[in-house]
Amino acid sequence: MNLKLSAIESYFFHRSRLNLHSCFYVGIKLNELPKKSQLIAALKYTVIQHERLTCNVFYDELKKENFLQNILEPLKFCDLVEYRHDWDQLGETEINHIFQRYNFSYNENKPLWKILILPNQNQMLLLTDHVLMDGMSAIHVWETFMEGLQMQQPVEIDETIYSPSLNSSTEKIMSAPLYGDWPIPWNWHIVRQLVSRLHYWFPQTVVKNNRNLIQFANYSFPKDLLDDKPSDGTQKYKVKNTNHQWEFRLSPTHLNDILQECKANNTSLTSLLGALVCTSFEKIAAHEYTGSFLKIELPMNIRKPFERVLKLPSDDKLAVGNFIAVIEFNHKLHQNRGIWDIASQIQRAIRSSSEDKIIDKVNEVKLLEVISSQQYIEDKISLNNGPSSTFEVTNLGFQTFKDACNTSLPFYIVDATFNEPQGISSIFSLSVISTPGNGLHCCISYPNTLTKVLEPHWQYMKDYLNLY
């Protein structure tokens, strides 16, 4: 494999290379942990199905470009799996430790992912560099892993999970999957030219936040985000990753009741969560922030739009990779509007972006093709007094992992979790995933300098969702 990075993958690459993003994780909890030999067999099966798992990003000196290429050395079990016998839980300390300590290097014959196993919790966490895959990809990887785990296979003694193929060729260069085929209307050709020139000559016109965007008095950016920032051109940034982590759950019955309410109001769970955060923000004392509106970022899975617009067969071609666009929604405060009214507005924005405006949404992502991703990232930090959005809601949805939650199986998924590190794009984040056995699992990550400030905010959410 010799694959060009898409524009968004190039953005993720530079963000990680600057040390501004370590990894994210999607984890599963099993009824019991497999034996090592069973893990080896399942991993071999998974790696065969998803070639990207055998790749790293390498710089081609001749072409002066980065490519996703197959690793040229074997990968052993110990390269991909680490046991954490010392962790009795996945709490705030452990979560922040993951984002502080686990990251991945480029231009090396090493993987861009790892599985952490917490034996005391029967839990397995897939940690991955974002350049390799998005959140839905991690779901697909776990689905494949569980398929391999259920198969009756010979006992594995050889711990080599991957061996470079003698027949594999790195000569043929493949374009970034599908993004290169996406239609660019004439007006977007004009926008691309304009953005390219503006970012080069007047970067603030492209990256500067609206001055009315909410910023907290107790959150100084980038001071409360970074421990270090480059001073001599060689030093990297260092993100604190000391966020407070609050997790809440909704039982399957409770989740079903809320989903029925969403259905009755023609909204989705994602829209409701976004509206709930907007409404609860009204409980925060006005002197704690400046600005008049919140901005929500809602990452959108664009696999189905790709299939629809490019007339692709519905297969596993889009299983693992980065196929996301971001929906932005602005909410003006103090409008005295109800939760379902706000949720309906958010839902309209989601529906419009995923249907009528999907050509535009993907072309917004493709604007990263015409600017320097690295400069854009650095400008976002140096030219602003806060992240570009107030909060992010990423909902991976209700996942059965292709029936891997079926309790009649020898190994089945009991629960799932999902989380991401402190970042440059939002002040706090909600990472959500739901399963049949344990319902909804939401991880909320926010700066520890805002713990007291946000107490009324979270209390309102607890009261609304009956989290007692």
From Swiss-Prot:
It is an enzyme of class 2 (transferase). This is N-acetyltransferase SLI1. PANTHER family: ALCOHOL O-ACETYLTRANSFERASE 1-RELATED. GO terms for biological process: response to xenobiotic stimulus. The lineage of its organism: Eukaryota, Fungi, Dikarya, Ascomycota, Saccharomycotina. Confers resistance to the sphingolipid biosynthesis inhibitor drug myriocin (ISP-1). Inactivates ISP-1 by converting it into N-acetyl-myriocin. Cooperates with YPK1 in mediating resistance to myriocin. Pfam families: AATase. Its EC number is 2.3.1.-. Transmembrane segments: none annotated. InterPro entries: Alcohol_O-acetyltransferase (IPR052058), Atf2/Sli1-like (IPR010828).
